[in-house]
Amino acid sequence: MNTTTPIFSKTDSLKFFRTLNSRVNNYFKENNLDRTGNWKLHLKTIVMFTIFLTPYFILLALQMPIWAYLLLNVVIGVGMAGVGMNVMHDGNHGAYSNKSWVNKIMGGSIYILAGNVYNWQVQHNVLHHTYTNILGHDEDLEAGRIMRFTKEAKWYKFHKFQHYYSVFLYGLLTFNWAITTDFLQMKRYLKRNLSYGEFKKPVIRWTTLIITKIIYFSIWLVIPMVLGVTWWKVVLGFLVMHYTAGVILSVVFQLAHVVEETENPIPDENGEIENTWAIHQLFTTANFAPKNWLVNYYTGGLNHQVEHHLFPNISHVHYDKIAEIVKQTAKECELPYYEFKTTRAAIASHFKHLRELGRQPQLA
């Protein structure tokens, strides 16, 4: 991870973001709307937690064949991803509610999804949203040697198969959160004195991490075993749950930034980025299936990543409305607005891009 901070240009001769901000602010003012969540988000919260937790209690209460047990764990995984995208995500961006304590509760749902609030806010809010698609700064591009997400990353022979094995690795996302990622990230972030908001003492961060991990594994592994579920069924179900959630979350994340159209800007020798932060988001981010109601609903507006990156503190329930404002403003300024009409088209572009990145680079 590169610790030299990139510097974005301060020159916006097009006045893109100033114009866009004014128009979006006018939209909320004219329609007398809060920028945070509303009753639609509150209802969706109930729906997503129901999908997530109801199968868990059924598994504890009833004896069932292995196929039914695993199927319910798939449903739990679907609900787990749904809670993460719709509830936890808005909460940790301060976009769920205009009350900070509500945001903390909703953001804290990450603890039963396998993650950690501090780590997520640093990786996502601080690093990813600030340095989007900049190798060495945006950790969403970091997958060790096994995946190559940018042309600047070192190439290995096995990368020519990455568009095949990537799906298997994507399924390990949340499992890794639970087992290793949180511990490695916390050590790294605390060493760099990184924080989103108040910087708390390391002992508080580590204590919170350890206690919440104990609670997490107690809920998903210990309690089912204590109540009589065979240990191997519990472990297998745990893996199925995580694989399901991991694939869903990874694919949704990748469709926003690792596709053919999006760019990976490189800082110059002075560490400077060519564009302003807002214009940088347009070049590095893409939407998909913006008119698909089900995709909009389930992904928590993460199919409107352009709007999310420009306005991370606005709840996703508003993205479909402000999207036209963003699109029109970008068009007027002759700036890109990347968008795939369908999820299928975005997925195809992602895996085609992985295949291209897996080819051996030609020597200059």
Q: Language-model segments: which ranges?
A:
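C-terminal, non-catalytic macromolecule-binding modules
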Residues: 253-277
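Glycine- and acidic
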Residues: 5-7, 33-40, 91, 106-111, ...
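C-terminal, active-site-flanking charged/polar segments
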Residues: 241-254, 258-259, 326-336
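Membrane-embedded catalytic scaffold of the fatty acid hydroxylase/desaturase
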Residues: 75-201, 269-361
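Short, charged cytosolic
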Residues: 3-26, 175-189
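Membrane-interfacial segments
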Residues: 63, 91-95, 185-188, 227, ...
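Membrane-interface, cytosolic juxtamembrane amphipathic helix immediately N-terminal to a transmembrane helix
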Residues: 21, 25-43
